[in-house]
Amino acid sequence: MTRFEREEWGVIGGGPLQVFDTELGRIGILICYDSEFPLLGRALRDCDIICVPSVTEAMAGYWRVRIGSMARALENQCVTAMSSVVGPAAWSDALGDSFGAGGIFCPPDTGFPETGVLAAGDICVPGWTFAEVDLAQVAHVRAEGVVLNRDHWADQTGRDGTAINVTLR
């Protein structure tokens, strides 16, 4: 939960994340701020697509969510689909002006754009952002990619504690 959600609304985290088996593939959801946490993304490692709906009241917030969405696509070798509320929200007491853009992100690997961006909407312009997603390509990258980030996650175990401080003089 963001500071506002915790401090103003008293919101607390819920139960485990869910994976939905659909005709479009296995889909998970990381809502906005959740996309900024690798372990939440890792819980969705079996998803082909992770949806990231968001609302941010500053461009810095948009970029944090976008960078998180791109990182989750890289780590899980999947596609992430980010949507953003944009513009004023006079209908809501909780929201001010919102900034952002939609984006469809992928691992920058074989068969995908080297930028990791399948599609990107215009900043603060309402509209749809969409791309063709080839689930066979997702499966191919997971099995035969240049790197196998998703499979090598366990290699971090034991190295993910506090780093050793080394003084160089």
Where are each of the predicted segments found?
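Active-site catalytic loop in hydrolytic enzyme cores
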Residues: 1-45, 58-71, 147, 157
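A generic secondary-structure signal marking the coil-to-beta-strand transition
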Residues: 16, 26, 77, 127-129
